[in-house]
A protein has these predicted regions:
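Active-site region of chymotrypsin-like
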Residues: 7, 121-137, 164-169
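Residue-level recognition of beta-strand microenvironments
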Residues: 41-44, 72, 83, 107-109, ...
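Gly/Ser-enriched beta-turn/beta-hairpin loop segments
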Residues: 48-62, 97, 109-113, 119-131, ...
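Terminal peptide-recognition signature
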Residues: 36-41, 53, 67, 77-81, ...
Length: 169
């Protein structure tokens, strides 16, 4: 029976002072703990485009985004992402932290909220990959306040894993 680890990230607030950097250690620690839960998602889609002579032709395009492993049931790993990442897909591929890729299916979407959940069959994930990935423990957004520092971890523009910080406004 395959089971991904559970990753818990710190809910500690980042602190600053006039003589120190902005929570460098906390950002590093949170990032290190969260990375096994972050995936890259590649969307292959077929679109009709107009050619030079006014006719239409089908063209395959590729786009990329990121997701976070949010759950696991008896048969699949569940990943949250944005609807715009998976919209119009003919094929979805999820790439894990170890660089291994598997096909994924859309479980559900909400275009108004730009949310989607995709699933990867556990039977398609090698044991060596399962040992490296983790299900994220999500925080409580009701505890978030304006002015809190936040960390965004993802796959910016498909270039690989990226980290940035910001402030809730």
């Amino acid at each position: 029976n395959k089971t991904a680890k559970t990753t818990t990230t710190s809910n500690a607030k980042l602190t600053t002072s006039t003589n120190s950097s902005i929570g460098t250690t906390n950002v590093t620690e949170v990032t290190k703990n969260a990375m096994p839960s972050i995936v890259s998602i590649t969307n292959m889609s077929v679109q009709e485009v107009q050619n030079f002579f006014g006719g239409t032709q089908k063209q395959e395009s590729e786009s990329a985004g990121s997701g976070i492993i949010i759950g696991q049931n008896d048969s699949e790993l569940l990943i949250a992402t944005n609807n715009h990442v998976v919209e119009g897909s003919s094929t979805l591929t999820v790439t894990f932290i170890d660089g291994k890729s598997v096909k994924a299916d859309i479980k559900g979407t909400d275009s108004d909220k730009d949310l989607a959940v995709v699933a990867v069959p556990l039977s398609e994930i090698k044991d060596s990959t399962m040992d490296k990935i983790a299900v994220a423990t999500l925080g409580n957004s009701d505890q978030t306040q304006v002015g809190d520092q936040v960390i965004a971890i993802g796959n910016a523009l498909g270039y690989g894993q990226s980290v940035t910080t910001g402030i809730v406004s």
